[in-house]
Amino acid sequence: MNTSITARELFDQQRDKLALRWVAGQKGEHREIQAGSNNARRPSLAGYLNVIYPNKVQILGTEELAWLDSLDARQRWETIEKIIQVQPLALAISKNQSCPEDLRAAADESNTPLWISPKRGHELLNHLSYHLARTLAPRVTLHGVFMEIYSIGVLITGEAGSGKSELALELLSRGHRLVADDAPEFTQIAPDVLDGTCPELLQDLLEVRGLGVLNVRDMFGDTAVKKNKYLRLIVHLTRPMTEPTPSGYERLTGDSGSRHVLDLDVPLITLPVMPGRNLAVLTEAATRLHILRTKGIDPAAMFIARHSNLLERRTP
């Protein structure tokens, strides 16, 4: 999924938090950063003024403005031209410092957004860097029901009619929490972290065949819904009639594997859907088993080791 952010969107999203004022270059509100547009030669999306390897959002603190003031007229104008020529998304001045008139004029002439904030430079840097990195991070929408089960994020997947929503409803009645139904969005916010959220349109809603759309918050209370959760496990529901009979080894270890999501391999456990099986209990057990495995505890491996030791002792 391609993502981008314009200068206007960034300003509106951070205006209240950073008390931003737009003082010049208002016509540049449509300047845009696209996901994946950064390259190895650029230090970061947002950073202190860097003329050699410019950031997309250039922050001018006390030292940066003092450095500009220390230049002679020719050097100062050449430096301002370099800042403007690379077309940054925006320039941001910290601590409500006065904006130099030549910088303001250059920003207006080139339609370069110029903002002023009462926040200190490092506060601007931290907020803008985090917000841009999260907004432009790789993201994908997966079909399924995303829930918090025993404090970890579990995505329930399967074919249409496999019982995902009914399973989610049963898990909700057992005290677990819903993050998103049908189309959870996952963002890779770190090399090994996928953060799952719910689209605004589907917030708090769960669709169950025969019942229609249910408002989980109204039915089960505020504690039954969760704003976001890191994806740690996928439970896939499958119809065994179309699958081969599990081998003896699979009967010991279960049908487990992984699914590639963005740049990560997420652990996956497959549960056959058959009459009489309590899928809610099985899903809870699968989640507990995953938690044990992350701690290095594997019951199947323990059994195989015991069996091997027993055979060795009985071998003459």
UniProtKB/Swiss-Prot annotation:
Entry GO terms, CC: cytosol
Cofactor: Mg(2+)
Ligand binding (ATP): 158-165
SUPFAM superfamilies: HprK N-terminal domain-like, PEP carboxykinase-like
Source organism superkingdom: Bacteria
Catalytic activity: [HPr protein]-L-serine + ATP = [HPr protein]-O-phospho-L-serine + ADP + H(+); [HPr protein]-O-phospho-L-serine + phosphate + H(+) = [HPr protein]-L-serine + diphosphate
One Pfam family linked to the record: Hpr_kinase_N
Entry keyword set: ATP-binding, Kinase, Magnesium, Metal-binding, Multifunctional enzyme, Nucleotide-binding, Serine/threonine-protein kinase, Transferase
Domain notes: The Walker A ATP-binding motif also binds Pi and PPi.
Protein name per Swiss-Prot or TrEMBL: HPr kinase/phosphorylase
Species assigned in the record: Xanthomonas campestris pv. campestris (strain ATCC 33913 / DSM 3586 / NCPPB 528 / LMG 568 / P 25)
